[in-house]
């Protein structure tokens, strides 16, 4: 088994506390509302939403995947960090056991946010994951993030 790590960093004009509330804490409600073609629904299968919780995300008709299951490892509201693993679903190929994700939102000097993400692909056997394989997922996540950012700009009184 191998572990392949990819890091990404991008910025937003939205303050970190507001972005964390929308992007992490209320994502299960907000994303199906603003991008139903991407995510149809999210439901908790086990737990209370905190660490140890298992969630099932059902994708919308615009996706070529059906569902995934996430296991939440940590949510730190004060430091704006979130970590979880993709543990099941058709987004995992036969060569990938799981994918660990860590997201940290850091307040930027200009009042916005620096978003730092780390993805760790745990492969089965000697399979190698190349960055080109990860690129499509990064692009979809970036598009979804831009939708959330746009929603927050259009609805400035929400998530304060």
Curated annotation (Swiss-Prot):
Gene3D superfamilies named in the record: 3.30.530.20
Organism expressing this protein natively: Fragaria ananassa
Sum up the protein's function in the record's words.
May be involved in ripening of fruits.
One of the GO BP terms on file:
abscisic acid-activated signaling pathway
Q: Which SUPFAM superfamilies match?
A: Bet v1-like (SSF55961)
Per the record, the gene is FRAA1A.1
- Mind telling me which Pfam families this protein's record contains? Bet_v_1 (PF00407)
Q: Which family does it belong to?
A: Belongs to the BetVI family.
Q: Does the keyword Cell division apply?
A: no
What are the entry keywords?
Allergen, Fruit ripening, Pathogenesis-related protein, Plant defense
Query: What binding partners and quaternary form does the record give?
Result: Monomer.
What's an example GO cellular component term for this entry? nucleus
Does the entry feature the keyword DNA-binding, yes or no? no
- May I ask which residue range the UniProt record assigns to the signal sequence? none
Task: Tell me the protein's name.
Answer: Major strawberry allergen Fra a 1-A
Q: Name one GO molecular function term.
A: abscisic acid binding
């Amino acid at each position: 088994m191998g572990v392949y790590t990819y890091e990404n960093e991008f910025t937003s004009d939205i303050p970190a506390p507001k972005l964390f509330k929308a992007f992490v804490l209320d994502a299960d409600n907000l994303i199906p509302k603003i991008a139903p073609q991407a995510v149809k629904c999210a439901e908790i299968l086990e737990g209370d939403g905190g660490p140890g919780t298992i969630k099932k995300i059902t994708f919308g008709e615009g996706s070529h995947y059906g569902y995934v299951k996430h296991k939440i490892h940590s949510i730190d509201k004060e430091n704006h960090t979130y970590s979880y693993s993709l543990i099941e679903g058709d987004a995992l190929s036969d060569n990938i056991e799981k994918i660990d994700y860590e997201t940290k939102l850091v307040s930027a000097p200009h009042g916005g946010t620096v978003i730092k993400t780390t993805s760790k692909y745990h492969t089965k056997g000697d399979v190698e994951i190349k960055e080109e394989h990860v690129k499509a997922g990064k692009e979809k996540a970036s598009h979804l993030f831009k939708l959330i950012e746009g929603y927050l700009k259009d609805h400035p009184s929400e998530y304060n």
